[in-house]
């Protein structure tokens, strides 16, 4: 077989596409629009590794398919370029982050273009461009004017390495999400956004979104809506009441002590003199801990205040303790403890010898462990004999009638700590005037540009490095024209990504952030693709900003992203010696893949599948893959590795197989005889239509690996024919095009099949031909045959499910049960699992 220079073909076709503006879409669509968005990358100095393009390849397949289906496709790319890594690099090297960011963007753009992605580069944006962050600042001002941004000196998560505050969402297992350093608690003046005012809507509007259920669950859990009751406890000998929130008002008769947060404002007033020293010491210890450390259920600490509360349902005096597992920022900062029916309260009570009263009947009792299940109420006066839900309602009614409480809803979600004490971020457009107070910068003076400085070192005092630039800080108050100072904190890395999908629609507009008519026609994003790690960071923040803009009348739709899909992580093999040292691929003899050895010594190495990292020497650079195999093999292999959403290891044997397939396709495409006069067979025509249906459905469902399999089957049949009907030749190239655009476009052109393949209509299946093929399927419910159906061979999975659910006997055995899953075994069986 003649050696094929795929790299030459790649460059040729990419230039043709770019010269002819094939992926540029008018700002106002003419045909039905399809807005496909990738989560834009942070342009790091390391460039792309093979894991990054997985999502980009999926979106590109979808985009090319939609273009061929007649849509005006919006498919932009840009750069989320503010953030700590560029600033840290500037500190280490003395090179301004603006310079390194530009260089990194140039490299990322080159790498992405080399993959043949169908991006509309006329829409390119960069969050560090003043023409972009002018509008980020403008949106902040709208949030401020709406009363949703405020200053507060609060205990925050402080990273001593990054020397900046972090939002709760940026802390993972008590460590900084960015650098892994253990977080400290520190009181610092911050700008905070009232995301909590949107908690209900952020929760309710998840309904109807086509998002992965796991992501919806993460957002629901992060918002953490709790429905229960607020209860007022009198404090013995004091006028003040202690207010608590509980999701279990039915257990009030089992409340045997109370716990308040060490930060609770009432603590100092109620602590008895003999306990003041112990309480003060405990408060100091708690102040040094992070919220994560305080949540460690294995470390139960606390101090008795000497004070007592009165249980409002039975008049009993119960002790008031302080413990750091109660957080001031959640609920009321105080809890009623029911140790018989809460594991943490139980362990605390056991440690400190506090009373435990069973109020929900259990077979085992509560001598050895708390009972957290449902049951009948006992030892609870008027609630005795009731079930939990009934007793909750009865207790809330009692509290309301007595004037000591009532129904209440709370949220786990906290307001968003928005400011950062670093240089490389958007300046917050606020001025501090000794006379006028906090004053917004006039919109006509935006953008407030970052000053060029030579020292980016964070101060570590809670002040941004900008505080050390007096010529920038000192300004004039927009209201009174007196001396004033600029806000020196900067915005977090999430600010620019909160609204970038809107700017892509109208990136050059200098009058507004997006033309209203364009926004109405092009929003929302029809398909958003990116990592699941952003579920409670970017995705939550972006939805919040969008809802503010919706309330202000700037956007038409309530939600920004109609459909969301996550790619799985691409892992890689690492090779490690017995001494624990990792070795790079160039050091390893892989002639026997089952027994990797060190080239220099022959030492046997341990092979593991791990996340790519420089320290493990298993990062695979796409430039190397492209140089060896070309873009189409790279793209197609990433889609063929396994289910899109699953994690899977990069395997050089796999890409070799795809490369061989594409070489066969190209050689066949160059040499095979093809003409309209060549006759087809019914079997081949049926296979053609089946393949069209299969590939189309699989692209829509992100089942790219099975689409590739279907294409391989179709090709194997075509490659056995000496004279291929032109209809089949064109169909195969068109179906393969989204996966391998370069060689298909090249063959399309060389065989004079017509104008650009990417602008050719997507093939249509002969449905009448497929309808002649009916098949019978058995139906099982929980493993037992309950019926059968006859469907057409072209029926989609959804059509098969719908017909199976309507089969009378199947319907009978599903009645009153929850559907768990449906497994369709092609041409044989439908297995329905219910519970």
Swiss-Prot record:
It is found in: Cytoplasm. ATP binds at residue 614. One of its GO terms (molecular function) is aminoacyl-tRNA deacylase activity. A motif ('KMSKS' region) lies at residues 611-615. Disulfide bonds: none annotated. It is an enzyme of class 6 (ligase). It comes from the Bacteria. Keywords: Aminoacyl-tRNA synthetase, ATP-binding, Cytoplasm, Ligase, Nucleotide-binding, Protein biosynthesis. Its EC number is 6.1.1.4. InterPro entries: aa-tRNA-synth_I_CS (IPR001412), aa-tRNA-synth_Ia (IPR002300), Leu-tRNA-ligase (IPR002302), Leu_tRNA-synth_edit (IPR025709), M/V/L/I-tRNA-synth_anticd-bd (IPR013155), Methionyl/Leucyl_tRNA_Synth (IPR015413), Rossmann-like_a/b/a_fold (IPR014729), tRNAsynth_Ia_anticodon-bd (IPR009080). It catalyses: tRNA(Leu) + L-leucine + ATP = L-leucyl-tRNA(Leu) + AMP + diphosphate. A motif ('HIGH' region) lies at residues 41-52. One of its GO terms (cellular component) is cytosol. GO terms for biological process: leucyl-tRNA aminoacylation. NCBIfam families: leuS_bact. Belongs to the class-I aminoacyl-tRNA synthetase family. PANTHER family: LEUCINE--TRNA LIGASE, MITOCHONDRIAL, LEUCYL-TRNA SYNTHETASE. This is Leucine--tRNA ligase. It comes from Elusimicrobium minutum (strain Pei191). The lineage of its organism: Bacteria, Pseudomonadati, Elusimicrobiota, Elusimicrobia, Elusimicrobiales.
């Amino acid at each position: 077989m003649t050696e094929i220079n795929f790299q030459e073909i790649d460059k040729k076709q990419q230039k043709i596409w770019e010269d002819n503006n094939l992926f540029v879409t008018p700002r106002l669509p003419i045909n039905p629009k399809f807005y496909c968005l990738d989560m834009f990358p942070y342009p790091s100095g390391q460039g792309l590794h093979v894991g990054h393009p997985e999502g980009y390849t999926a979106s590109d397949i979808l985009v090319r398919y939609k273009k061929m289906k007649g849509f005006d496709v919006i498919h932009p790319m840009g750069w989320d370029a503010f953030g700590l890594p560029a600033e840290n690099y500037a500190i280490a090297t003395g090179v301004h982050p603006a310079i390194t960011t530009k260089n990194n963007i140039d490299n990322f753009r080159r790498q992405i273009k080399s993959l043949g992605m169908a991006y509309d580069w006329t829409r390119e944006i960069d969050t560090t461009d003043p023409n972009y962050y002018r509008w980020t600042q403008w949106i902040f001002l709208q949030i401020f004017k709406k009363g949703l941004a405020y200053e507060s000196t609060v205990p925050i998560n402080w990273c001593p390495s990054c020397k900046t505050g972090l939002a709760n969402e940026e802390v993972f297992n008590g460590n900084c999400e960015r650098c892994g350093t253990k977080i400290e608690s520190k009181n610092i003046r911050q700008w905070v956004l009232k995301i909590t005012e949107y908690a209900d809507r952020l929760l309710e509007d998840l309904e109807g979104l086509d998002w992965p259920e796991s992501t919806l669950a993460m957002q629901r859990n992060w918002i953490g809506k709790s429905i229960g009751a607020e209860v007022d406890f009198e404090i013995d000998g004091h006028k003040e009441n202690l207010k608590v929130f509980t999701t279990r008002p039915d257990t009030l008769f089992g409340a045997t002590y109370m716990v308040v947060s060490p930060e609770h404002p009432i603590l100092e007033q109620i602590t008895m003199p003999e306990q003041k020293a112990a309480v003060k010491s405990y408060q100091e210890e708690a102040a040094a801990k992070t919220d994560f450390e305080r949540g460690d259920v294995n470390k139960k600490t606390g101090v008795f205040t000497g004070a007592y509360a009165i249980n409002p349902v039975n008049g009993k005096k119960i002790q008031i303790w302080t413990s750091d597992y109660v957080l001031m920022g959640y609920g009321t900062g105080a809890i009623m403890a029911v140790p018989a029916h809460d594991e943490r309260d139980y362990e605390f009570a056991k440690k400190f010898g506090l009373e435990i009263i069973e109020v929900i009947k259990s077979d085992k009792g509560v001598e050895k462990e708390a009972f957290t299940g449902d049951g009948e109420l006992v030892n609870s006066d008027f609630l005795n004999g009731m079930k939990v839900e009934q007793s909750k309602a009865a207790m809330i009614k009692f509290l309301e009638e007595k004037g000591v409480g009532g129904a209440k809803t709370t949220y786990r979600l906290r307001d968003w700590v928005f400011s950062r004490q670093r240089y490389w971020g958007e300046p917050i457009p606020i001025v501090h005037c000794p006379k006028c107070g906090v004053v917004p910068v006039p919109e006509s003076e935006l953008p407030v540009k970052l000053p060029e400085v030579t020292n980016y070192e964070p101060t570590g005092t809670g002040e941004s490095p900008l505080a050390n630039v007096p010529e920038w800080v000192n300004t004039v108050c927009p209201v009174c024209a007196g001396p004033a100072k600029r806000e020196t904190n900067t915005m977090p890395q999430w600010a620019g990504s909160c609204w970038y999908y809107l700017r892509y629609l109208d990136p050059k507009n200098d009058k507004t952030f997006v033309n209203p008519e364009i926004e109405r026609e092009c929003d929302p994003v029809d398909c958003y693709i990116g990592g699941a790690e952003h579920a409670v960071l970017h995705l939550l923040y972006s939805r919040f900003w969008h809802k503010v803009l919706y309330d202000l009348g700037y956007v038409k739709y309530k939600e920004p992203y109609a459909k969301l899909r996550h790619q799985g992580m691409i892992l890689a093999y690492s090779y490690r010696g017995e001494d624990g040292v990792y070795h790079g691929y160039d050091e390893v003899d892989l002639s026997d893949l089952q027994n990797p050895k060190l080239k220099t010594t022959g030492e046997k190495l341990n092979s593991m599948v791990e996340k790519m990292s420089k320290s493990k020497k298993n990062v695979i650079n796409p430039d190397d893959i492209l140089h060896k195999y070309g873009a189409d093999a790279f793209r197609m292999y990433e889609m063929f590795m396994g289910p899109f959403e699953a994690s899977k290891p990069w395997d050089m044997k796999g890409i070799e197989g795809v490369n061989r397939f594409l070489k066969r396709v190209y050689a066949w495409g160059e040499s095979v005889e093809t003409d309209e006069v060549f006759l087809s067979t019914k079997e081949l025509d049926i296979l053609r239509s089946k393949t069209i249906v299969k590939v189309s459905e699989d692209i829509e469902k992100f089942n790219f690996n099975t689409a590739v399999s279907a294409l391989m089957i179709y090709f194997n049949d075509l490659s056995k024919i000496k004279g291929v009907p032109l209809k089949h030749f064109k169909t195969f190239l068109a179906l393969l095009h989204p996966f391998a655009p370069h060689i298909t476009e090249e063959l399309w052109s060389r065989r004079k099949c017509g104008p650009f393949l990417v602008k050719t209509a997507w093939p249509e299946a002969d449905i009448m031909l497929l309808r002649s093929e009916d098949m019978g399927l058995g139906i099982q419910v929980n493993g037992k045959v309950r019926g059968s159906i006859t469907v057409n061979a072209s029926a989609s999975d959804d059509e098969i499910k719908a017909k199976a659910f309507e089969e009378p006997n199947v319907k009978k055995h599903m009645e009153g049960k929850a559907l768990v899953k449906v497994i369709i075994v092609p041409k044989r069986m439908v297995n329905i699992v219910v519970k």
